[in-house]
Amino acid sequence: MKIIAISGKAQHGKDTTAGFLKSALEADGYKVQVAHYADLLKYICKQFFGWNGQKDDAGRHILQYVGTDVIRTQKPDFWVDFIISMAELFPDTWDYLLIPDCRFPNEIDRIKSAGLDMVHLRVVRKNFTSPLSKEQQAHPSETALDNTTPD
């Protein structure tokens, strides 16, 4: 299985890129799964914190707070280890596993150190004004990969 980790700022087209890749790869006969690190986070926020699923200011705050400020602070590899476990448990189920919400260096490094075949792509949306607040734009989940080089 080949893993493609896609990074980029909020609303720069990570999911759109994953959708294009999925369509193209499936057209060539490959089995493709799209899995977000945040899939499990969203479940936790809905089930345990009453999040309504909206990515408005309050929604982004709860996602950043639970996902980064609490869980990543205490267990930095929590999200990536879940995805690695899925890849290791089902190695022959998909030809490609696309992860369109890579936001931290360990989410790349940990997959590589697990011996999985991975490439890191970054999506950049030029001339785009972010609708996020200055505080949200400065959050580590938006800035942690600023000085890394994709493959």
Predicted feature locations:
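Conserved phosphate-donor/acceptor-positioning beta-strand/loop module used by diverse small-molecule
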Residues: Y96-R103, D109-L132
